[in-house]
Amino acid sequence: MKLKNILIVVKDIEKSKQFYHDLFGLDMLLDNDGNMILTEGLVLQDEKIWRNFLEKDIVPKSNSCELYFEEKNIEAFIEKLEKLYPSIQYVNRLMTHSWGQKVIRFYDLDGNLIEVGTPIGSQPL
């Protein structure tokens, strides 16, 4: 068995597609009417479709999982984030863990938690 994709629920697929392209360079591989697959295996699912499948409420900012990305030049990434999405809501501004990794956490447009960190292997021990 193999993990194929990670799916997140979004209110506006086009805005979310642009967000993930702008910040992470993800491109669309398949658009299947409310179910969009991006490069790196991220799937955007229209909230209305997901709600019909589950018959449950969607809880933004539930903080129960996160999408994790690595970026060598995290300061340049933060500049880009703040330029393109100045009203982004941070969970943690830039911080450095005890093992030397720099990270930030913020919510995407729909309250999905994202962490961006410097590559772990590049930290001096």
Where are these regions (language model features)?
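N-terminal beta-strand motif that seeds the catalytic metal site of vicinal oxygen chelate
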Residues: M1-K15, C65-L67, I120-L125
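Short glycine-enriched loop/turn motifs at secondary-structure junctions
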Residues: M1-L3, V59-S64, H97-S98
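Short beta->alpha transition motifs characteristic of CBS
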Residues: I8, D46, S98, R105, ...
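Amphipathic alpha-helical segments
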Residues: D12-L26
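Vicinal oxygen chelate
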Residues: I13, L67-L113
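A generic "structured core" feature
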Residues: K17, M36-I37, Q45, I88-V91
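Short secondary-structure junctions
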Residues: G25-L30, S87-V91
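Conserved short beta-strand elements that form part of the metal-binding/catalytic scaffold
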Residues: D27-K61, L113-T118
